[in-house]
Amino acid sequence: MPDVKCVCCKEGKECACKGKECCTTGECCKDGTCCGKCTNAACKCADGCKCGSGCSCTEGNCAC
């Protein structure tokens, strides 16, 4: 299983999750380990996404 890269909400950087659930759980990765949940405020929604507080970080993207 190849490493999955997702946008880490902190500093807007990508990181390798190395098969962990960081991307699907909305956590940020650091050195291949989960290091904290993303907050709605940290999420960067795509253009046109107007979820407000209903925005959640999943796989580097925000979904309503």
Swiss-Prot record:
Organism: Sterechinus neumayeri (Antarctic sea urchin)
Annotated protein name in UniProt: Metallothionein
Disulfide links within the chain: none
Its biological purpose: Metallothioneins have a high content of cysteine residues that bind various heavy metals.
InterPro entries linked to this entry: Metalthion_4_echinoid/annelid, Metalthion_4_echinoidea, Metalthion_dom_sf
Molecular functions (GO terms): metal ion binding
Keyword list, A-Z: Metal-binding, Metal-thiolate cluster
Pfam families listed in its UniProt record: Metallothio_6
Family from the record: Belongs to the metallothionein superfamily. Type 4 family.
Metal-binding is among the record's keywords: yes
